[in-house]
Amino acid sequence: MDTLRMTNYIIAVVFFVCYAYQFLYIPVPWLLAKRKAAKAAALEATPHNYAVLICARNESAVIADLIGSLRSQTYDQSLLHIFVLADNCTDDTSAIARSAGATVYERFNNVQVGKGYALQTLLSHLEQDYPAGFDGYIVFDADNILDPGYIAAMNRTFSQGYDIVTSYRNSKNYGDNWISAGYALWFLRESRYLNHARSLLGTSCAVSGTGFLFSRAVLEETGPWPFHLLTEDIQFSVHEILQGRKVAFAPYSFLYLSLIHISEPTRH
């Protein structure tokens, strides 16, 4: 028992040492946010032409809400182009997305399964159908809802010269149960006390699943999304940081998503 207790103690110390530096991030937004915000406000945002990328599998219940929130953006709608990849759908996701005003592609492949392959297919279609490309590409999950100023806030940060920008994820259903509340608190910590703090300190943030933007330069370098791990967002972040790029954080780009219910199985 003494050996087991000592092993547990050593593991606990190692994990504490690995995570302790994050406590130093907590006061950073309080100390630096106003100064950085004043500098950012003095910079003029340049209008950019964006492609919105949505990969959806059997999301007929929510896809129209996301597209509706995109159409309600304060950003110039002529510079916003919505593309949906209906991935192995057995419902009417594609029809609903089309009726909501999106350009829809469909994919049926039961071997290469996952969001990474779906994004690769969607970007390959855009490469063929829109050879002029876009200034930036913004990735969302189908169950997201956006604050009306989301795209404008992302564009302000993108206009500062960053090739990759991530946003402030939040929850649509914090109070449903302890799991959704836990996820929501995690997103608060990740956005406010990790990504925001890192951005204020001039280091790189990380992309997390949904609500991120990358430039045409990134796409030209990597090709149509070669990131296929289960955690393709982390794979993408690490790859780009190793290439010398920083992932920036847009602190006022609020995105809301539904979090898992206790009665729901986790979906792959």
Give residue ranges: language-model regions.
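Acidic helix N-cap motif at the loop->helix transition within catalytic regions
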Residues: 64, 91-98, 106, 149
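A conserved acidic beta->alpha catalytic loop
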Residues: 86-94, 109-111, 145
